[in-house]
Structure formats: C-alpha cells, structure tokens
Amino acid sequence: MKLIPHLRISLLFCAALFTVTIIPAKSQQIAFTWDDLPAHSALPIGETRVDVGQKLIAAMKDAHMPPAYGFVNGVQAEREPLSAPVLQMWRDAGFPLGNHTWSHPNLNQNTIEDWQLDLLKNEPLLMKYMGDGDWHWIRYPYLGEGETAEKRATVRKLLAQHEYKIAAVTMSFGDYAYNEPYARCVAKNDAAAIARLDTAYLDAAVAAITYSRTMARALYGHDIPYVLLMHVGAFDARMLPRLLKLYRNRGFNFVTLQQAEADPFYKNDLDLALSPAPDSFEEAMIMRGLQMPSRPALSIDLDTLCR
C-alpha cells in the first residue's frame, strides 16, 4: 500500500545524497522492520507475492539477520488470497508479526472510533499466526499518530489498554516508491531504466543513513539504535541482498526491534502511559530550534519512469 507524505516520514522522499557533513560509520545497530504484509504495491509480470516473500526471507537468512517484524494489513490477504501464504512463510522462518491495522487507515484522517475498530479487526489474524508470540506492536499506517495532541494522547491510552507498544521509525529512505516503477520497467523490458532504479535506491539508503545520524548526533550527541522502515515489495526483494551488504559495509550490525527499542530514546514508545514525546527526529529538531539537514529533490523521476 503506497504511503503519503507525513512529518515523520519526510525523509522517505530523499532519494539523493543530502548536502550534510558525511559521518563515517562505526559499529552501529539497526533493526529492519517490514510493512504491508502480505502484499505491497505492484507486482512485475511473472512474479507472485509468494516469490517476493521467499526472496526477502532468503536474503535475511543468508545474512544471518535476527528475526524481523512484519506488520500486517489483513485486508490484503482478503483482496489477494494467493498472498496469504506469505504470513505462514514469515512465521515458519521464525519472524514475528505485528499490527498495521486491518485496512491501513490514516489516523490523522479518521475518527478514533473507526481507527480503533480497524486495529482490533486485525487481531484475530495475528493471534492465528503468532499464538503466544508477542504481536502487540503497532506500526501506525502512514505513521500518523493523530493530527492533534489530544487525539494522539487518547489513542495512546487506548493502545496502552490493549498492551501495545509502538514500532517507531528512525530511518527510512522511501523504498516503497520504487516498486511501481519497477513493475512498469519490467513490463517494458527496460534494463537500463531498472539499472537506474538500482542505483537510485542504494543512493537513497546511503543518504538516509547520513540524514538520520546527523539529526541523532545533533539532538543527543551520539547515535542510537535505528529502526528502519521497509516494505514487502518486489523491488525491495530484488535489492535486499545488496542493501544488507551496504549496511554491513557501513558498519551496521542487525538487531531486533525489541533490542533497538530498549534504548532510552524509545521509552515513550514502549510505555504508552508516559506523555507523548516528539514522534520524529524532525519534530525534535524543530522543537529545539536546531538546523535541519537539507534535502534535495529526487535524483530520479519515479512517477514518469517507464510510462
């Protein structure tokens, strides 16, 4: 499901290198998390959702990654029944599932009552696949936590009553945006355009590393364990082996979501009885009057590529 712009994910549109001071990578931690299981975005001709799931799981296993949470929209299994096996594959691989709501509604554009119903509708599916495992993690669709402070606080109380924790996002590079153009380029058999996508995707990942690390150090004087937002798309599956190598080469170690969010930075995401904290690096930078790193335009026009 395609995302839309939001304060917390403004960095998703940064697919070129940022004009900020390059920070040399040291041994650093990152937790991969995956949204929109079991089906995300367009499929290239000849590829299935199961193919995508198998490639993602194989790449993570080959890299000896710890279990990565997949956040589920149950409606996708209903709309595309052939995608449903991806959920069992994910579990068979030892990877956990969390709640991304049933149909991906944006809390900022829906009533609390409607959004809560959609959240709870997803729970039987999660219980089916997770059993006694910890599925009480919520990834807000569109990362919308409520357009007002009052609404955000009310929803946090509701989530606390249902024993949820928030799966935060502290690094992202707009991976979702590459899946539709990839399907178009495959249909046109345009190898040159696909090669451009490959390069732009990896460049965007590098830019996001610099962007997030720059803000973390400006705010706190040091790195934190980052939580990376990814999507279960076909292009993501194509690129994952190279992406994992990129992070490793830049000094990152892979950890679980629980390990990353054990850092004090995330305490308000784990204990929803606490008052809401700034929900992004960007918001925290603005509140503290710090200068934001600059973000140039995309280096590739994803909307027109292979049209």
Region roles according to the model:
Residues K61-H64, A168, H222, V232-R307:
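C-terminal domain-boundary segment and adjacent tail
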Residues P85-V86, T154-V155, R242-L243:
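A short acidic, amphipathic alpha-helical/loop segment
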Residues P44-I45, R79, P105-Y129, T148-H162, ...:
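Alpha-helical scaffold elements lining the catalytic groove of polysaccharide deacetylases
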Residues K26-L143, T148, L228, L246:
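Active-site beta->alpha N-cap acidic-glycine motif
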Residues A93-L97, A160-K165:
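Glycine-enriched alpha-helix->loop->beta-strand junction motifs that scaffold or abut catalytic
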Residues S10-T21:
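Bacterial N-terminal signal peptides
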Residues P96-N99, L125-G133, D190-I209, P278-L298, ...:
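Short, basic, helix/turn surface patches
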Residues M1-L12:
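Bacterial N-terminal signal peptides that target proteins for export
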